[in-house]
């Protein structure tokens, strides 16, 4: 029940790679090119903006995929899900430690840029950036929907799925690529968003009362977007022109759900 990109350290890995890119350029990519209004704009800044965006996107993807590769490697050795979860948490702590060291040795502008990005926000995503986000996300979402049959077969056990003719090793690799790609895309645009990906599948199961991925995946996608927008709405409620960081609100929705699921399984 605790499997998620933030718990297994995937988001932390993506965040570490982005931190290396951002802090290496003193925050110029984050503030000037990637987050700024000139991204994909006119004139000479357009090419720089695209380069900055691609650097962050590629860095997030590489960081997420490296952590996913580590988790996949240990999953072939460790049978206990609890031990695998602890390994994921330790990987996340290592990434967080490296990020802290990078912040310590970086410039004030670089630290500010990364801290603003790391708190998570939808407000810095412009309409031009959405044109990049939609096709990239749709590719991975459609690919995940094509895996409904093997995922349903996996519910009855790996041996049963193999007897039906599904290649479990190839399925795991495909799921690895899809998960890493989606995590990288969301992290690159909005920063590391916690608890949404962890809690939404459990809420969807409680609402529809089934494990059938043919229904569960679409409901989870829709519900995840609704919860994300709801959290973003709460972030904009305070007066005074300030916006609360997204990661300050998402645990208010996600943590109670996870606690409930753990108590129910007990």
Residue ranges and their predicted role:
Residues 1-266:
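Alpha-helical transmembrane segments in inner-membrane proteins
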């Amino acid at each position: 029940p605790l499997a998620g990109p933030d718990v297994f350290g995937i988001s932390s890995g993506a965040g570490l790679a982005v931190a290396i890119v951002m802090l290496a350029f003193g925050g110029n990519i984050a503030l000037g090119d990637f987050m700024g209004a000139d991204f994909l704009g006119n004139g000479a800044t357009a090419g720089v903006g695209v380069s900055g965006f691609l650097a962050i996107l590629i860095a997030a993807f590489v960081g997420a995929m490296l952590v996913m590769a580590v988790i996949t490697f240990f999953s072939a050795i460790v049978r206990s899900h609890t031990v695998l979860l602890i390994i994921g948490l330790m990987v996340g702590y290592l990434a967080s430690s490296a990020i802290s060291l990078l912040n310590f040795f970086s410039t004030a502008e670089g630290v500010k840029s990364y801290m603003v990005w790391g708190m998570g926000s939808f407000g810095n995503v412009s309409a031009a950036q959405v044109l990049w986000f939609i096709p990239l996300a749709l590719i991975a979402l459609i690919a995940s929907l094509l895996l409904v049959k093997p995922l349903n077969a996996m519910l009855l056990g790996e041996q049963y799925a193999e007897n039906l003719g599904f290649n479990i090793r190839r399925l795991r690799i495909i799921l690895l690529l899809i998960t890493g790609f989606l995590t990288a895309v969301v992290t690159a645009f909005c920063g590391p968003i916690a608890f949404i990906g962890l809690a939404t599948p459990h809420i969807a199961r409680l609402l529809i009362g089934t494990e059938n991925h043919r229904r569960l995946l679409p409901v989870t996608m829709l519900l995840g977007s609704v919860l994300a927008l709801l959290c973003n709405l709460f972030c904009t409620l305070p007066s005074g022109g300030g916006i609360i960081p997204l990661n300050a609100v998402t645990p208010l929705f996600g943590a109670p759900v996870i606690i409930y699921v753990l108590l129910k399984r007990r």
